[in-house]
Amino acid sequence: MSDEEARQSGGSSQAGVVTVSDVQELMRRKEEIEAQIKANYDVLESQKGIGMNEPLVDCEGYPRSDVDLYQVRTARHNIICLQNDHKAVMKQVEEALHQLHARDKEKQARDMAEAHKEAMSRKLGQSESQGPPRAFAKVNSISPGSPASIAGLQVDDEIVEFGSVNTQNFQSLHNIGSVVQHSEGKPLNVTVIRRGEKHQLRLVPTRWAGKGLLGCNIIPLQR
């Protein structure tokens, strides 16, 4: 392989997707470099513990005769080069871990979105299979300008929910009357079926110029 091919190969590898095995290989390389650095420090230690900065000449300016100058210079040079390599590898490890963590977060977000979508699909499927909720009452008249008219109620709207009253707990119109009396000035959620479509309304029982707090007439539907 030529130098150019080697550079291209290396570039394409770096541009690829980072894997756990890539990080493991970088960690192995890091440990290998650290072992080499220690080995070279051991060489310096064996030479009178000379270290990285002690002079290699005596007080008269002559090369020291009590140490192997070649070994010391070589070990010092190796340590400097290896420390640079170690710094570069640590940067690669940091970048690789960052990519892995970012990918994990993206995967978690995708999984959560997919789970939410699936749950919503199941819920929608259940709703469709159950069909529209059954109405328990019907609006048969509305006075203009009344709270019911302002809320958007229309004649022939079939009520499936009126505040806390619904198909499951409705017994008589007294249930609706009780909710209205206890909700004067407070918004009530009212759900109706109008021409086959469900509509959500907010009705506020209020004293007005006409009779009652709603200004509409509601009749029960036969079950």
UniProtKB/Swiss-Prot annotation:
Tissues of expression: Expressed in all tissues tested, highly expressed in liver and kidney.
Residue numbers bearing the Phosphoserine modification: S129
UniProt subunit comment: Interacts with PSMC3. Part of a transient complex (modulator) containing PSMD9, PSMC6 and PSMC3 formed during the assembly of the 26S proteasome.
Stretch list, region Disordered: 103-141
InterPro entries per record: Nas2_N, PDZ, PDZ_6, PDZ_sf, PSMD9
Pfam families in the cross-refs: Nas2_N, PDZ_6
Function of the protein: Acts as a chaperone during the assembly of the 26S proteasome, specifically of the base subcomplex of the PA700/19S regulatory complex (RC). During the base subcomplex assembly is part of an intermediate PSMD9:PSMC6:PSMC3 module, also known as modulator trimer complex; PSMD9 is released during the further base assembly process.
ATP-binding in keyword set: no
Biased composition (Basic and acidic residues): 103-121
GO biological process, one term: proteasome regulatory particle assembly
Signal peptide positions (record): none
GO cellular-component term (any): proteasome regulatory particle
Protein name: 26S proteasome non-ATPase regulatory subunit 9
An example Gene Ontology molecular-function term: bHLH transcription factor binding
Superkingdom assignment: Eukaryota
Domain PDZ: 108-195
Record family assignment: Belongs to the proteasome subunit p27 family.
Keywords for this protein: Chaperone, Phosphoprotein
